[in-house]
């Protein structure tokens, strides 16, 4: 039995980034993955923040040759109003573009690039037991079709996503947000010939259907488009009235206005999926000889596409701290890991809540939105939620409400309202 420096559970974006960083620095790493790749997973819209993570871990070259659809920003639609936000208008220095991707293919490319570094990935292995006080550090038991295997290492990184391996095995407190939100989504076929008849066919777009209901359109470069509705569960009564989820989805499609007849007769590739009460978080992100990264640490919301960005950021952060600790540098996992991860999540949560209560809609579609404000907001939406020089990060818990109030005042009395100082 090989003794490793680190065992990583999960071969998604968080696990592959963490494993690659450690392997590049000479550490022995193994990945245990429950599923066989390629496999479907949601989270198809990426953020520029992650591009730097893939660059730093040497995974970017494998992605660059795939010809994924380039995402340079996002379009927001409210009735007849349209707002295009470009990542190039970014307050924080960093990447100004990314991709929108079919995750089954994308994650498989990442996994193969990780394996090419000499990191073994054991697919089809379900973790059934964890011992955190083993003489070697940790011992993990995993089972596949041929039986059980044991792995030992100095440290365990749980990047198992929604599977939440350690949450289940250790009985960790995983809390649901309880906000009543749900998502229904699917993939449809759109041939290049059909797309040639559509205006801006590759533009990733988000339409506000109601204050707390929105519709996503994410076109891929493989003639497939991801469609989804997200919002409070009261908007999904079509599920109760329809003979199938595809019929319910078609009923929901009739509510969108921003795409005309484009989705009048959708060619579903599979029956739409439904996820209820998807938001969750863990009280503790680390413990003796282990750390949680990615979605198993918590997930906020599909809006603004923060999932993969937090996955790669937390995976890289954990790997860097682990490498530092193995080189004699003291690491306080609470102060150095949990606090910054939760701080970034809190910033994004402010924007998510401002989206669902309508404040951000007001700001987005306000007439004559100042360029500096737009750049600072775009920086957050690009994933740079740790840039405290950005007032829309540093004052995230109050500045959006204040600005929305200013927009309301301006609409009522343009001569009175003043935009808050964001310098």
Summary of predicted features, one role per range:
Residues 23-42:
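Glycine-rich FAD pyrophosphate-binding loop
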Residues 91-112, 237-244:
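Short beta-strand to alpha-helix junction loop
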Residues 113-259:
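Predominantly flavin-linked oxidoreductase catalytic cores and closely associated redox partners
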Residues 15-16:
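N-terminal Rossmann-fold NAD(P) dinucleotide-binding loop
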Residues 40-80:
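N-terminal FAD cofactor-binding segment of flavoenzymes
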